[in-house]
Amino acid sequence: MTWQSDYSRDYEVKNHMECQNRSDKYIWSPHDAYFYKGLSELIVDIDRLIYLSLEKIRKDFVFINLSTDSLSEFINRDNEWLSAVKGKQVVLIAARKSEALANYWYYNSNIRGVVYAGLSRDIRKELVYVINGRFLRKDIKKDKITDREMEIIRMTAQGMQPKSIARIENCSVKTVYTHRRNAEAKLYSKIYKLVQ
């Protein structure tokens, strides 16, 4: 996979994603120390409840934190990060604002499952459920982003104006605003705030 690295941040993201191919780096993003440490400890803590060995999990799985801090990179580069984790069992850890995007990637990619990290959720139980391969489409209770909404989110994230998006998508400006409003309702946030 080749990344076009125009900025140092792109280089950092590339290095973090390439780390995932090494067996000792199975949690992305490793630069989020609290998430990395917390999830590592949680996986060790639930060891007796999962069918696979910890070594197999470290080797075959990638756990991705879809936090609002990193959503911009995931939206703008979804083909790249999905290619980077090809062949791995990908588990998305989704906060409330990223649930609809996680569901979109689950439906449209080879994602093993989604752990919804809401405040009232039992993350241990959900993590065991996904690792053990029991997460199914019927488990998705929340909305998912549609293909058209995702295209509009990507173009908005790139700084494109609704009029330009309408031309590219061959639709009216009103339709662009409607899709954007629908996506924002599912994301519980304005798109521009998520992709800053």
Swiss-Prot record:
Residues 138-196 form the HTH luxR-type domain. Keywords: Activator, Cytoplasm, DNA-binding, Repressor, Transcription, Transcription regulation. Signal peptide: none annotated. Induction: Negatively regulated by H-NS. Positively autoregulated. Also positively regulated by IHF. One of its GO terms (molecular function) is DNA binding. Pfam families: GerE. One of its GO terms (biological process) is regulation of DNA-templated transcription. Part of the ecpRABCDE operon, which encodes the E.coli common pilus (ECP). ECP is found in both commensal and pathogenic strains and plays a dual role in early-stage biofilm development and host cell recognition. Positively regulates the expression of the ecp operon. Also represses expression of the flagellar master operon flhDC, and consequently prevents flagellum biosynthesis and motility. Acts by binding to the regulatory region of the flhDC operon. This is HTH-type transcriptional regulator EcpR.
